[in-house]
Amino acid sequence: MTGDGRGVLYPAAMPPLHRLPAPERVSSLVRWFWIPEWNIVPGRVSRQELLAFPACHLAVEPTLVGLAGPTTRRSHRDLTGRGWTVGALLRPAAVPHLTTDPYALRDRYQSLALPDLHRAVTTAMTG
């Protein structure tokens, strides 16, 4: 799937997004993977307005691996420069593997120490 704007308030302003089904071996833990890539003109910002979504996401970014908790309100992410993210929409069964206190993740984004995952994804995304 490509260009699926579900969860984004203004999909026409969204950078290219690839949405891929989870492979069978991880489908009990991941609903799908999402990969946006952007290249914003210097000095410009692309604000991505997001709807609340009651699920956790694991996201690998160029500088970190993060775990986003379920959201209870609209939010946004400002994109600048060139970048990418490889994200996974997690099923509830995956969350206890990543945190001991899922409730504390509500409306939060926390960094995770997963250097091997970060290295593998960064290598795949940057060649």
Where are these regions (language model features)?
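Alpha-helical bundle regulatory/interaction domains
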Residues: 1-127
